[in-house]
A protein has these predicted regions:
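Local cysteine-cluster metal-coordination motifs and their immediate loop/turn environment
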Residues: 1-9
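Conserved non-cysteine loop/helix-boundary elements of the Radical SAM core domain that shape
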Residues: 10-24, 42, 46-194
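N-terminal glycine-rich anion-binding loops that anchor highly charged ligand groups
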Residues: 1, 36-37
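A short, N-terminal amphipathic alpha-helix
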Residues: 24-35
Length: 194
């Protein structure tokens, strides 16, 4: 698990949603939004969607079937090292339109120090593959990661521009309890940007 990750703390949920949960959420959203759903996407965030158990992932995507004509697309977030042609074929067949990659940094030393489990090269390769399939590409960046600095953050931003994604999300690093990053902070080994 990465140094800053704790999905239970981030989402406040200790359980995984079921396909029925997805259907009920989408049914309520469709009812609440009415015609505005035509401008809304179904989204699977809060982790690495393509890294979860394949049968579970497919069951969640199956739960979206009867709602696809009501929403303008499906957006997922995942890790760069969990993208390949097989997974993109599956996502395309289920109507996924946008894929956001949790790249976080384009400096390998920062990725390694934060236990990301992927390299900058995997961001380049998966981004190219995603774009070749016609998906909208989003890249996620975190500023102020452990072992990063302003220059490395600027390098990441400049590299993102070269990749030319459709969207970019920039997050500040937040220290969550019960993470390696919290331990580093408490031990005085990590100082967040002020």
């Amino acid at each position: 698990m990465c140094s800053f990750c704790n999905q239970n703390k981030i989402t406040g949920q200790a359980y995984q949603p079921t396909p029925l949960d997805v259907e009920q959420t989408l049914d309520k959203a469709a009812s609440d939004l009415g015609e505005r759903t035509k401008n809304a996407e179904i989204a699977f965030f809060g982790g690495s969607f393509t890294a979860i158990d394949r049968i579970y992932m497919l069951s969640l995507l199956d739960a979206t079937k009867k709602f696809r004509d009501k929403f303008c697309g499906i957006r997922i977030s995942t890790r760069p090292d969990y993208i390949d042609k097989e997974i993109l074929d599956i996502l395309k067949s289920y109507g996924v339109t946008s894929i956001e990659l949790g790249a976080q940094s384009m400096s390998d030393d920062v990725l390694f120090a934060n236990d990301r489990g992927h390299s900058a090269e995997s961001v380049f390769k998966s981004s190219e593959l995603i774009k070749s399939y016609g998906f909208s590409l989003g890249l996620q960046m975190m500023t102020g990661l452990y072992k990063s600095d302003i220059q490395k953050d600027l390098y990441t931003a400049e590299t993102f521009v070269k990749i030319n994604p459709d969207t970019v999300r920039i997050y500040p690093t937040v220290i969550m309890k019960d993470t390696k990053l919290a331990e580093l902070y408490l031990n005085g080994e990590y100082t967040p940007y002020s």
